[in-house]
Curated annotation (Swiss-Prot):
<comment type="similarity">
    <text>Belongs to the short scorpion toxin superfamily. Potassium channel inhibitor family. Alpha-KTx 23 subfamily.</text>
</comment>
<dbReference type="GO" id="GO:0090729">
    <property type="term" value="F:toxin activity"/>
</dbReference>
<keyword id="KW-0528">Neurotoxin</keyword>
<dbReference type="GO" id="GO:0005576">
    <property type="term" value="C:extracellular region"/>
</dbReference>
<feature type="site" description="Aromatic residue of the functional dyad">
    <location>
        <position position="62"/>
    </location>
</feature>
<comment type="function">
    <text>May block potassium channels.</text>
</comment>
<keyword id="KW-0964">Secreted</keyword>
<keyword id="KW-0632">Potassium channel impairing toxin</keyword>
<feature type="disulfide bond">
    <location>
        <begin position="28"/>
        <end position="46"/>
    </location>
</feature>
<protein>
    <recommendedName>
        <fullName>Potassium channel toxin alpha-KTx Tx773</fullName>
    </recommendedName>
</protein>
<feature type="signal peptide">
    <location>
        <begin position="1"/>
        <end position="18"/>
    </location>
</feature>
<keyword id="KW-1015">Disulfide bond</keyword>
<keyword id="KW-0800">Toxin</keyword>
<feature type="disulfide bond">
    <location>
        <begin position="33"/>
        <end position="59"/>
    </location>
</feature>
<feature type="site" description="Basic residue of the functional dyad">
    <location>
        <position position="45"/>
    </location>
</feature>
<feature type="disulfide bond">
    <location>
        <begin position="37"/>
        <end position="61"/>
    </location>
</feature>
<dbReference type="GO" id="GO:0015459">
    <property type="term" value="F:potassium channel regulator activity"/>
</dbReference>
Length: 62
């Protein structure tokens, strides 16, 4: 049971702050993005944004 807890904890930490060649990646979840944009009567989509050495995956409403 303790091993399972440690594995889940590490999975959550790595998922929230992934390091790839010095770039931090943030994760956008499509269902959550669509729900947030529905309030504005728009369609939501996860898109990649690049800023200096960082790459972000963010939600955009169209």
């Amino acid at each position: 049971m303790q091993k399972l807890f440690i594995v889940l904890l590490l999975f959550c930490i790595l998922r929230l702050d992934a390091e790839v060649d010095g770039r931090r990646a943030t994760f956008c979840k499509q269902p959550g993005c669509q729900e947030a944009c529905k309030k504005e009567n728009k369609n939501g989509r996860c898109v990649d944004k690049f800023d200096n050495n960082f790459s972000y995956n963010i939600c955009r409403c169209y």
